[in-house]
């Protein structure tokens, strides 16, 4: 696993920093601002919903169900594949400089705007059957992904510390707390004649035009690593201005269970004594970041 290798590398380099410390070591504080670009993001949804026939709010008499509703069905599942995102970020770091090697603790904030809409891919048989006749539209939307992260970074500086230009590379491990605005919409056919879920025309009419809508702010914590490279320019004895490029990669994160805002145009329940809740999980997610940094040695 890449994350494990990075953790081991940071640990080894950190021990080297400590063992190589001398009276000439310098403390520093660094502030940065920049932009980020993220690759496509995939979100996976799942809930404990029953089929429309088993919804006792829609079908209180249990008509046309046979034995279909005798036991709880497997969880439904779906996926939305969204496009690329971009945004901005800011950071604050404190560190120690032991000549060629630096050890640093960094805080990062980022906001990545996707503002994208994606058709919903369905993977369970019950929902697939409804997609062929009952469900007219199914899509997901996401807005901004915002996160607060913390990293332990180790850098290697090339060239003497008194040089005007100092290129460097680095690696870091840490984690973030991410928040994602997610919306899921399932719209049923307005025309009852196109719905074959029920034979009864009154039940068809009751289902027609109903919607299932979820509006969630999905939050989760996850671990990750980053690879860094950049160059600093010495402005004076204690100040440096630099440009830094980073690739940050985080593991998947999962939000908690959330009630649907409405389920088939009624409350998030099927009248069976439990709420219907859904969860959203992302694939591994990451981003490229490019920033300008101001460093002060003290």
Regions found by a protein language model. Give the residues of each.
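Short, contiguous, well-ordered secondary-structure segments
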Residues: 21, 145-172, 245, 298
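Hydrophobic, lipid-facing positions within transmembrane beta-strands of outer-membrane proteins
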Residues: 88-92, 148-152, 223-229, 288-292
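Cleavable N-terminal export/targeting peptides
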Residues: 1-26
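Repeated loop/turn-to-beta-strand initiation elements of outer-membrane beta-barrel proteins
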Residues: 100-103, 162, 237-241
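Extracellular/periplasm-exposed beta-strand and loop segments of Gram-negative cell-envelope proteins
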Residues: 38-85, 109-149, 158, 176-222, ...
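Outer-membrane beta-barrel "beta-signal"
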Residues: 26-30, 284-298
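Transmembrane beta-barrel strands of outer-membrane/channel proteins
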Residues: 31-35, 96, 105-109, 169-175, ...
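Residue-level signature of outer-membrane beta-barrel architecture
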Residues: 96-98, 156-158, 231-233, 296
